[in-house]
């Protein structure tokens, strides 16, 4: 009965926190560039490519589309839209009859001034994919899967509602990142274990690993002379009125934030293993329990570091292909600042994984054996009475 109450209270806390985070304004909802505009869905009725110029793979000019507005105050109206082509495969898109597009309507009162084709509408597919993921997770993992969904949503909301506005507001990215990571680490592990010493043990180990990653990351970012502008889209912030942002510190914070998930995973694995050992052998010493945790950590570290490597390098396959196609020498590749930044990300994140194993084994051994011994002494006192 007590365990059920604890588990239900964990879910209630998670739901309340989600509602609170959703209610928090970012402060950037009413951006000036979106005033007098409306972003809605529109169905493409026909297209006109007469002014589109093609040169190999590149297209430039304007594609004109006949549209039916599907949302907003102009719903049901037919109008013309313009799709501007800049000659960039990355940002350009072409529409076909029957496509559902996201468009930006500039208007004055009830009069449409212009309609710009923003992109293909994908939100419905994104929601479908997310719903499939949630259903599959809950189906296979039950209540644990539901708590995982809670932690996922809370993480997304915390980053979007708190961390990003704080960074834009000029808050020190490293200290803010540490606090946000600490909050998410404790909360996510709490959703796994609930009110238990295992939460304290796993959280302590993971946070010590995050702190170590932060220190090493800051030192070597400076030694590597990496500027934060290596992050995608970061330089555009400087030209959008945020000249005072410290992009390098934001890059530093991204190193330990990115690795914190893997560290939490390893900390939970080790804590669960140590707890299982103590359950089977209640009289075990904390040193033996910690040693067992280290054995589990050694087995997991090999795959976890490779996981980080694959996660970070996956987005740079095209860059590596370009280097190979050009016959770039390996020393030039490794010295290239974008590659150096990824090497820094991967190795420093792996440092965190290597350190989180002994930290968690130690905290789990001390905290969980202490709990078991207290329970044993209480049972002896009850039996004696």
Where are these regions (language model features)?
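Hydrophobic alpha-helical transmembrane segments of membrane transport and translocation systems
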Residues: 295, 299-302, 311-385
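Structural detector for short beta-strands of small beta-barrel domains
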Residues: 36-61, 101
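Extended, hydrophilic extramembrane loops/domains of integral membrane proteins
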Residues: 87-125
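Helical hairpin unit composed of two closely spaced alpha helices linked by a short loop
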Residues: 260-320, 327
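Hydrophobic secretory-pathway targeting helix
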Residues: 1-37
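Transmembrane alpha-helical segments that form the functional core of multipass membrane systems
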Residues: 131-138, 143-238, 245-258
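Alpha-helical transmembrane segments and their helix-start/interface "positive-inside/aromatic belt" motifs
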Residues: 4-12, 197-210, 301-307
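Pore-lining and gate-forming transmembrane alpha-helices of multi-pass membrane transport proteins
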Residues: 205-210, 240-257, 303, 307, ...
């Amino acid at each position: 009965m007590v365990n059920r109450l604890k588990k239900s209270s964990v879910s209630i806390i998670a739901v309340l926190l989600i509602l609170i985070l959703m209610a928090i304004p970012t402060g950037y909802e009413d951006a000036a560039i979106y005033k007098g505009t409306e972003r809605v869905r529109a169905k493409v009725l026909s297209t006109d490519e007469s002014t589109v110029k093609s040169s190999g793979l590149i297209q430039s000019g304007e594609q004109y589309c006949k549209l039916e507005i599907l949302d907003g105050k102009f719903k049901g109206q037919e109008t013309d839209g313009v799709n501007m082509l800049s000659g960039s495969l990355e940002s350009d898109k072409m529409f076909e009859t029957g496509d559902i597009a996201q468009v930006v309507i500039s208007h004055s009162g009830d009069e449409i001034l212009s309609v710009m084709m923003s992109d293909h509408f994908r939100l419905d597919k994104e929601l479908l994919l997310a719903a499939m993921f949630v259903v599959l997770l809950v189906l296979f993992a039950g209540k644990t899967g539901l708590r995982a969904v809670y932690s996922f949503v809370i993480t997304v909301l915390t980053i979007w509602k708190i961390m990003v506005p704080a960074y834009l507001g000029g808050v020190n990215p490293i200290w803010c990142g540490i606090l946000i990571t600490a909050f998410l680490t404790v909360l996510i592990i709490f959703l796994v274990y609930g009110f238990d010493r295992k939460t304290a043990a796993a959280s302590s180990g993971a946070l010590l690993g995050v702190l170590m990653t932060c220190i090493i990351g800051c030192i070597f970012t400076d030694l590597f002379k990496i500027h934060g502008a290596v992050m995608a889209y970061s330089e555009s912030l400087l030209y959008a009125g945020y000249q005072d942002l410290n992009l390098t510190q934001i890059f530093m914070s991204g190193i330990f934030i990115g690795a914190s998930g893997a560290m939490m995973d390893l900390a939970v694995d080790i804590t669960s293993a140590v707890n299982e050992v103590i359950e089977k052998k209640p009289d075990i010493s904390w040193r033996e329990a910690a040693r067992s945790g280290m054995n589990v950590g050694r087995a997991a570290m090999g795959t976890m570091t490779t996981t980080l490597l694959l996660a970070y390098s996956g987005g740079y396959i095209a860059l590596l292909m370009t280097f190979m196609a050009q016959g770039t020498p390996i020393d030039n590749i490794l010295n290239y600042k974008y590659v150096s930044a990824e090497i820094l990300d991967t190795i420093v994140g792996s440092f965190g994984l290597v350190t989180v194993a002994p930290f968690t084994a130690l905290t789990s051994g001390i905290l969980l054996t202490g709990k078991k011994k207290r329970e044993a002494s209480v049972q002896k006192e009850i039996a004696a009475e």
